[in-house]
């Protein structure tokens, strides 16, 4: 028996408890077997318990799509050219094309009337975008002048058939009109004056029994003069 000079009772304590382990052992749980028979015969499956507590994630269902369209082939949302029919979301009803005043998107190089509102184009009823491929038909605007305005314009036309620059601006301001309205009035008045002059000339020649010459030259000259004018399709 061992005796410690420092702790005399230590040897006596060991003598009374010779089989006492130095460290306490914890109870061990039996190891689970992972062979096929043990897995199939198990009744307490923790996976099922976990699935009850935490349901598996499911992807959200795709949004409802109109009939006749598959996912990834959805049409573009309707713009102001197409208006869906009430009660039939899959049916489209064409609406007339309306452009802001002062704009014409006609790509035809011969179409110079770009200051008037867009009315419609040929074959526009078949395709809402067919106006991009053909010359557009411009909507005429009729400007109504008062008798005082017409009288003043006629007086100025007798003085000079062409009015440009500050004179036209001052006249438009005096008559409470726009410069474009005054410009178009003088343009149409010149065309009317040329036609009247040609008719008067033919009438005088017919009185003397003279057959008037072919007016093709005069027509060509008049056409060239009209082409030199600004092509503003506005009636007075």
Curated annotation (Swiss-Prot):
Expressed throughout the embryo during pre-gastrula stages. Localized to the dorsal lip of the blastopore (Spemann organizer) during early gastrulation, after which expression continues in tissues derived from the organizer. Expressed in the notochord during mid-gastrulation. During neurulation, expressed in the notochord, archenteron roof and the prospective floor plate. Also expressed in the region that will become the epiphysis, the pineal body precursor. Gene3D superfamilies: Homeodomain-like (1.10.10.60). It comes from the Eukaryota. It is found in: Nucleus. GO terms for molecular function: DNA-binding transcription factor activity, RNA polymerase II-specific; RNA polymerase II cis-regulatory region sequence-specific DNA binding. Residues 223-236 have a biased composition (Acidic residues). GO terms for biological process: central nervous system development; negative regulation of DNA-templated transcription; neuron differentiation; notochord formation; regulation of transcription by RNA polymerase II. Keywords: Developmental protein, DNA-binding, Homeobox, Nucleus, Repressor, Transcription, Transcription regulation. Residues 209-236 are annotated as: Disordered. SUPFAM superfamilies: Homeodomain-like. One of its GO terms (cellular component) is nucleus. Residues 138-197 bind DNA. Induction: By activin, derriere, fgf2/bFGF and wnt8. Repressed by bmp4/dvr-4. The keyword Manganese does not apply. Transcriptional repressor. Plays a fundamental role in notochord formation, acting within the mesodermal region. This is Homeobox protein notochord. It comes from Xenopus laevis (African clawed frog).
């Amino acid at each position: 028996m061992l005796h410690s000079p420092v702790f005399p009772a230590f040897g006596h304590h060991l003598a009374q408890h010779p089989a006492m382990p130095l460290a306490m052992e914890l109870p061990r749980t039996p190891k689970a077997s992972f062979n096929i028979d043990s897995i199939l015969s198990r009744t307490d499956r923790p996976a099922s318990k976990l699935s009850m507590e935490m349901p598996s994630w499911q992807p959200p269902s795709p949004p409802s799509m109109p009939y006749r369209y598959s996912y990834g082939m959805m049409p573009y949302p309707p713009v102001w050219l197409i208006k869906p029919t009430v009660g039939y979301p899959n049916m489209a009803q064409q609406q007339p094309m309306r452009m802001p005043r002062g704009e014409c998107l006609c790509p035809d190089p011969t179409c110079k009337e770009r200051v008037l509102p867009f009315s419609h184009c040929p074959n526009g009823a078949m395709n809402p975008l067919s106006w991009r491929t053909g010359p557009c038909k411009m909507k005429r605007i009729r400007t109504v002048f008062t008798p005082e305005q017409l009288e003043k314009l006629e007086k100025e036309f007798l003085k000079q058939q062409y009015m440009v620059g500050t004179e036209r601006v001052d006249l438009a301001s005096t008559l409470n009109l726009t410069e474009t309205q005054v410009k178009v009035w003088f343009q149409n008045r010149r065309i009317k004056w040329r036609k009247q002059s040609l008719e008067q000339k033919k009438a005088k020649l017919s009185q003397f029994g003279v057959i008037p010459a072919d007016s093709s030259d005069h027509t060509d000259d008049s056409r060239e003069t009209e082409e030199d004018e600004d092509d503003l399709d506005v009636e007075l």
